[in-house]
Amino acid sequence: MNAVIDIAPAPMQQGCGDAPVLHERGQREVFCGLAGIVWLHRKIQDAFFLVVGSRTCAHLLQSAAGVMIFAEPRFATAIIDDRDLAGLADANAELDRVVTRLLERRPDIKMLFLVGSCPSEVIKLDLSRAAERLSRNFSPRVRILSYTGSGIDTTFTQGEDTCLAALVPELPASEQRALMVVGSIADIVEDQFRRVFDGLGIGPVHFFPARHAGDMPPVGPGTRFVLAQPFLADTARALEARGARRLAAPFPFGAEGTTLWLQAIAREFNVEATKFVSVVGPRRERAARALARHRTQLEGRKVFFFPDSQLEVPLARFLAREMGMVPVEVGTPYLHRQLVASELALLPAGTPLSEGQDLERQLDRCRAARPDIVVCGLGLANPLEAEGLTTKWSIELVFTPVHGFDQAADLAELFTRPLERRTRLVA
């Protein structure tokens, strides 16, 4: 059992820690940060997200969330119309009116986010000042914050990063030694991790963001935080500015990634090796057995990642090491080397890496490689399927619970399912 659990895996040859990266600066095809509201409004259960944007923003949110507006979801769009764009209306006065009406109708709201968009940035609407002004009117009943979900030079997962970074200055101060798990994960996954931490004797443990506005975790010099998502660079910097220290680790995708993630935490909190093995061992073995069936379908297959979610590097590591797949290119919108250093060290040596997007050039390389599966955005999937390539929507890997041991097989299945579908269609 020790051989299974006490792993400090040698990198595949020399890994990709110092590998050259192709920097692309061309045409892009990505969703904007507003997409993050879809999972954030489910995570923070008494928060409301008010997008200040266009009808296009409203259509995107409603379509992505799959929620009809008459169901009164905890998000909405304050539409910027022609009068606002022409400067004929006082946008701040209109915003105050909308917020006042919203909070009168929805007394259950405890935290309100004013979310900037491309249109609000174009007309230079200062939502941070608006949030301060409105907070004075509605405090302490409602906390009002602002962040940007604009798609200008960003990708869709950065909406969560800017949201959490805006929350960090509002967190209470604490000197207590504690663990903070940073990044939105499904409630069921959070509960699973909490049981593991309880078994290891690690505590107190806080998850950020919390499920309720009043339960946001404290932060200070005693805080040790570990990222659950690789796209939280601004949030990590904000926490470090508050005195917290980040624990470097691979991300908890797959049996190996989850074990190494927990191992980094256990080391920091001086968990005995025997206890770690007894708590983590059965869970890892169960995950490894569940993954074995999927490995037979994926081993030796080629995978190509278009830059979209910033999950690409950890997912490539999982597919290469645990599923036996061959990454022919791993493209990511932004390569934060410091955050993914542990992942890069575990990638197969010589794996082509690219940062940014030049869509036409990447399409040419993808067509030339003829991978067995392509991980890409929604806009590319159907055209590539029409060319005979099998695709997986990258946004599905964000929406689906894929962290931890119990979800490892679900993560693998997201890649086997498109291949099975293609096989049935051909037959």
Curated annotation (Swiss-Prot):
The alphabetized UniProt keywords are: 4Fe-4S, ATP-binding, Bacteriochlorophyll biosynthesis, Chlorophyll biosynthesis, Iron, Iron-sulfur, Metal-binding, Nucleotide-binding, Oxidoreductase, Photosynthesis
The residues listed in the UniProt record as binding [4Fe-4S] cluster, with positions renumbered to this chain, are C32, C57, C118
Q: Which pairs are disulfide-linked?
A: none
Q: Per the UniProt entry, what is one GO biological process?
A: light-independent bacteriochlorophyll biosynthetic process
Note the NCBIfam families from the entry: DPOR_bchN, PRK02842.1
Entry's cofactor comment: Binds 1 [4Fe-4S] cluster per heterodimer. The cluster is bound at the heterodimer interface by residues from both subunits.
One Pfam match, given by its short name, reads: Oxidored_nitro
Family, similarity comment: Belongs to the BchN/ChlN family.
Q: Which organism is it from?
A: Rubrivivax gelatinosus (strain NBRC 100245 / IL144)
Q: Which InterPro entries match?
A: LIPOR_BchN/ChlN, Nase/OxRdtase_comp1, Protochl_reductN
Q: What is its EC number?
A: 1.3.7.7
Q: What protein am I looking at?
A: Light-independent protochlorophyllide reductase subunit N
